[in-house]
Amino acid sequence: MSKILLIDDDIEFTELLTELLSLEGFKMKVVHNGLEGLNELESNQYDLVLLDVMMPVLSGVKTLKRIRQKYSLPVLMLSARDDQIDRILGLELGADDYVPKPFNNRELVARMKAILRRTTSRPASTDHSEQNYTENISKSLQFAGVELHSGRQQAYYQGCDLDLTGTEFALLQMLMRNSGEILSRELLSLKILGKNLTPYDRAIDMHISNLRKKLPEREDGLPWFKTLRGRGYL
């Protein structure tokens, strides 16, 4: 049973959402401001955080920033404002996904399950004959000094922890497993975020940008992956 921390100041909303998600099999804990959420994370482990953007005491964006300073667990942001700036800022700070209120209950549950799947298992890959990576029986994946451990969801570059979020880990893993192949934004959105790509949806682009910032320069001077305008990533 996945443990979910819901951080939202709307008491009536949290009661309804807790009832819904409990029926879906999630174990829920609710707090009503960002500071309470940070304190809860200090003392207990959770599989996913649902974080409201507009809150008193400490806003959702500021709470997310402090979460990312210490934790890599997935965060799904909720907001009554479908504001593109809020969405981009949240993704830049490391949110795994963003759902505007009011939302379709089934869509929210699907997004949550997609996040949890990608933080506990490897994404699907396509077959290719010549592989320039090594994957051994301990489920580690190696390429150009980067080593990924699927079971532990940990990534290293030359032995140093890369401190990736669950979404960044899954994205890097899929790119490494399909090195040399063009992966479209549509495919990455579906496989990594669990949703179809919509017009003006830049979630994948923001996750790629965050991943690039965390990866050091390769010793051979080559880019980790290339952006192919209108086609995807290579």
Residue ranges, per PLM feature:
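Receiver (REC) domain active-site loop signature in two-component systems and cognate sites
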Residues: 55
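Active-site beta3 strand of CheY-like receiver
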Residues: 44-50
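Short, Lys/Arg-enriched segments at the junction into DNA-binding effector domains
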Residues: 3, 114-182, 186
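Short hydrophobic/Thr-rich beta-strand motif most characteristic of the beta2 strand and flanking loop
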Residues: 25-32, 40
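Charged docking surfaces used in two-component/phosphorelay signaling
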Residues: 12-23
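Acidic catalytic/metal-coordinating carboxylates
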Residues: 32-36, 59-62, 86
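Positively charged, aromatic-enriched patches within helix-turn-helix-type DNA-binding elements
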Residues: 154-231
